[in-house]
Amino acid sequence: MKILYKVRHPNGVRTIYFCGLPLWSYNSHNRSRRFRRLKQRVFIFDDNGEHEIFYNYQLPNNIHLGGGGTNNIIRIHKTLRARNVCLTFDKNTSDNICVLCDSGDCSGLDMIVIFQAGHANKLYIGRHTVINGAKIWLGNGSELHLGDDCMLSYEIMIRTTDGHAIMDSATGEIINHQRNACIISNHCWLGLRTIVTKNAQIPDHTIVACGTVLTGKFTNTHTIIAGNPGRVIKTGVSFSDKSIFDLENI
């Protein structure tokens, strides 16, 4: 068995191994540039299985990891189309799970995800979902489930926690715990500058108007929600990912 050896990777990358364990990597075209070992556990998967990656250069294009924490797990489908996706973990986080597209025909994502202090947060993003610009905050053991075939516009804010505690002034008891998972179900359209707060849940085939603040749980499908706080303003509707022009000229 070799004690110290080098493995060549594509694009000029070299990894030095000691007793079978990777020590560090560098670019043979620019030896001053060393590659960082990932602090999180990252798995790339497809229908044939998954494999773990260990260095930042192995990440899919335009996906960036930052922060600290321990034992956080990220699963990324190999067909994911990403644009400037940044996942940041607070130094006090642990045991968080992030799934970016669970199978083939994957989403197109342009977003920033921040895991605040806390443990066992869960983020799940389904298939055929497009996010054009969103900031997502998770914390305190919360969960966000974003379903299949969704469209999210620009400047979307989703927070599964308030972040700071609100207490009863007499007893000191914290009164703003999140109670339920935050759920955006299948085939939902979130308009420009939608804000989704903790405990918010919307069912399949929901349209959310620009600037709406989603709070609480909605149960009726095929609706339009608008306002602050959001309320149902129209029923019996659906939407298409095609433009009006495209549909009128089929």
Model regions and ranges:
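Conserved metal-binding segment of the jelly-roll/cupin
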Residues: 211
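Flexible, solvent-exposed loop segments that connect beta-strands
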Residues: 168-175
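Domain-scale signature associated with acetyltransferase and cell-envelope carbohydrate enzymes
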Residues: 1-160, 179-187, 194-199, 204, ...
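Amphipathic helical hotspot of TIR/SEFIR-family domains
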Residues: 207
